[in-house]
């Protein structure tokens, strides 16, 4: 990802599209979060190995007691960050959380391809959640917001200082 991609301006129109979609999705964020992660694992089954509680679990993914809460947290954080992007001018995740997220992603071996799969899965999840609103403009808005969040996470991807 080039620095010009990361520093793309998030326009008022993009913000409006993201806010409108999130208003609809928010009430169903737990289910959508789970769908989002199931899509990731469908596209890249090996991504399960990045999660200690999934690696050797005999429990089906959709029944794993730890997956849904984690998926919900990630989905909500991603969407809330997108909604706040224009106002804040950057991804809005607490710095301490970003450092922790970056360190975990570094430690577990997350690479660029994982972020690409996650981007695709996120956009597909949103497209399916709000099909009547979906458009190339909305896809682009969510893509720009996701790219900003990923850039912030990648910046913090280094060994934990704790």
Curated annotation (Swiss-Prot):
GO CC annotation terms, alphabetical: cytoplasm; nucleus
Subcellular location, record wording: Cytoplasm; Nucleus
Primary location: cytoplasm
One Pfam match: Globin
Cofactor binding note of this UniProt entry: Binds 1 heme group per subunit.
GO molecular function: heme binding; metal ion binding; oxidoreductase activity; oxygen binding; oxygen carrier activity
Cofactor(s) demanded: heme b
Motif window: Homodimerization: 42-46, 112-124
CDD domains (UniProt xref): class1_nsHb-like (cd14784)
Catalytic activity entry: Fe(III)-heme b-[protein] + nitric oxide + H2O = Fe(II)-heme b-[protein] + nitrite + 2 H(+)
Binding of heme b, residues: 52, 66, 70, 100, 105
Membrane-spanning segments: none
InterPro entries on file: Globin, Globin-like_sf, Globin/Proto, Leghaemoglobin-like, Leghaemoglobin_Fe_BS
Family in the record: Belongs to the plant globin family.
Subunit details: Homodimer with distinct heme coordination in each subunits.
PANTHER family: LEGHEMOGLOBIN-RELATED, NON-SYMBIOTIC HEMOGLOBIN 1
Name of this chain's protein: Anaerobic nitrite reductase
Organism: Parasponia andersonii
Taxonomic lineage from the root: Eukaryota, Viridiplantae, Streptophyta, Embryophyta, Tracheophyta
Gene: HB
């Amino acid at each position: 990802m080039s620095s010009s991609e990361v520093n793309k301006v998030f326009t008022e129109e993009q913000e409006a599209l993201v806010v409108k979609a999130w208003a609809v999705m928010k009430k169903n964020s737990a289910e959508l979060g789970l769908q989002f992660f199931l899509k990731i694992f469908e596209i890249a089954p090996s991504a399960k190995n990045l999660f200690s509680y999934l690696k050797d679990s005999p429990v089906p993914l959709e029944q794993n007691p730890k997956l849904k809460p984690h998926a919900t947290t990630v989905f909500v954080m991603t969407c809330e960050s997108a909604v706040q992007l224009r106002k804040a001018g950057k991804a809005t995740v607490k710095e301490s959380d970003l450092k922790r997220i970056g360190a975990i992603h570094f430690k577990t071996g997350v690479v660029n391809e994982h972020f690409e799969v996650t981007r695709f899965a996120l956009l597909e999840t949103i497209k399916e959640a709000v099909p009547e609103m979906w458009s190339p403009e909305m896809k682009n808005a969510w893509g720009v917001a996701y790219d900003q969040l990923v850039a912030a996470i990648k910046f913090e991807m280094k060994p934990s200082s704790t």
